Amino acid sequence: SAPDENDNIDQQVNILDEELARYPDVIAISSVDASACSVQFDLAIENGIPIVAFDSGNSYQNIQSTCKTNNIEAVTTGTKNFCEKIGDSGEILLLVHDTVSDTAKEREAEIKNELAANHPNVTVTETIYLDQLEMLKKQIVAEQVGVTPEELAAAEAGEKKEETTGTGDASETIADAASNAASSSADESANETAQEADNELSEKMQQVNDGAAKMSDEDAIQYYMEKHPDLKGCIATNETVTQLAIRTLDQFDSEKHITLVGFDAGKEQVNALKDGKVDGLIVQNPFGMGYATVVAAARTVLEIGNEAEVNTGYVWVTADNMNDDTITPFLYE
């Protein structure tokens, strides 16, 4: 069982609750959020149900075994090859699949560590997190219509308060928050009344919300590509953001080649690799990971012990080696 979306933490917790109610012999889980599910895990342990993690680990202390890619080794390999392709200098975008999962945190940290240690002339100009993309869309439109970051933050805080309390009119809440931001602005026109400022900013906030709702994920990523005309490339940290980067580059009208290195090798990534849209892929071993997880789960039930962490491997794939016999087993549709 899995959530409908990769980042749906609440749904994963609900699924875990349902599975625990069946009192399974063992739980194997790839955690959406590295710090989530501790209550469910405590319940599992209390009922003698061991836990095995795979793909993305969890900070919970009583997990029997974690079967996953060694992200430090994999990301170091990918980052070195990426830097070689861009001439070991220039501006890049980092596209990270979320802010909460173990894999996202590890991969982002190691990319930046490798760049700082061995590629000082390569600069990450923007780090974009997929689970923050909706807020980034609002920031983009806000900049275009003249809403300051402080005003946007105040309005967002007002909207969240309205959602929590369930009282009052949403437009009034935005206006109140906007009033607070506007009243603190040093350059507010002296002859403009507070009510006029409220109304004007409330109208702009409506434009922000409407504009953000119409903006696609690809449009948002393209905005940041266009914002940095000297951009040389992008590194994407999982399959979802790699596919997003591919679609963005398809619609991005640029005369120069933007180097793209991503993770995993589904059908879309493999086709993009063939077409030269992707320059390299860090590909995990999905079959090996699944096999290792089943073995680890069986060993916990049989009480014969496990390695705390099982490295399931990876390969570096390019258009030049993708048809090699050692590579094709890692590719999937």
What are these regions (language model features)?
Residues 1-333:
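A residue-level marker of the well-folded mature domains of exported/periplasmic proteins
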